[in-house]
UniProtKB/Swiss-Prot annotation:
Coiled-coil ranges (or none): none
Name of the molecule in the record: Signal peptidase complex subunit 3
Membrane topology: Single-pass type II membrane protein
GO cellular component, one term: signal peptidase complex
Family note: Belongs to the SPCS3 family.
Entry keyword annotation includes rRNA-binding: no
Organism: Caenorhabditis elegans
Quaternary assembly: Component of the signal peptidase complex (SPC) composed of a catalytic subunit sec-11 and three accessory subunits spcs-1, spcs-2 and spcs-3. The complex induces a local thinning of the ER membrane which is used to measure the length of the signal peptide (SP) h-region of protein substrates. This ensures the selectivity of the complex towards h-regions shorter than 18-20 amino acids.
One Gene Ontology biological process: signal peptide processing
Primary site of residence: endoplasmic reticulum
Amino acid sequence: MHNLLSRANALLAFTLWVMAAVTAACFLSTVFLDYTVPTKLTVNDVKVRNVVDYATDEQQADLATLNFNLKVDFSKIFNWNVKQLFVYLVAEYKSKVNEVNQVVLWDRIVERADRVVMDEIGVKSKYYFLDDGTNLLNHKNVTFVLRYNVIPNSGYLRLVQSSDQVVVPFPTTYTTTRRS
């Protein structure tokens, strides 16, 4: 009859085929789901400071500091095919030099076992909001939007943008205090 190695090979090949079919079924069962959730985002206490930037030709840069409040419930997103979320806050604006400027200000990894309902109040930006030049002062249209990557157990990585955006006009004068 068949020896032990050929039987083990057949068993392993069948097991891998079944696992591939289950993985494909897992992906297909969640591919058409809507992963957008309502968010409530407010941006407060925006200050712009002019700093020296030796990395640019102008040697001037605008540094913005701000606080924000975020309320979002991600529990609807976590189905059995979602492993974790990578959530981040982006500021978008136009300047004379660049048509699109996007700056990530804050991020967080949300896992299934973590708290999936975020109610953050008075959060400071985690990363510097630095513009190469003086384009932030008196800017009328800086848009803040929450985005998140849905990291699945199987399937493709989704980029989801919150439907709610906040447009904030920036101050008309520089702040002169040392602390924000």
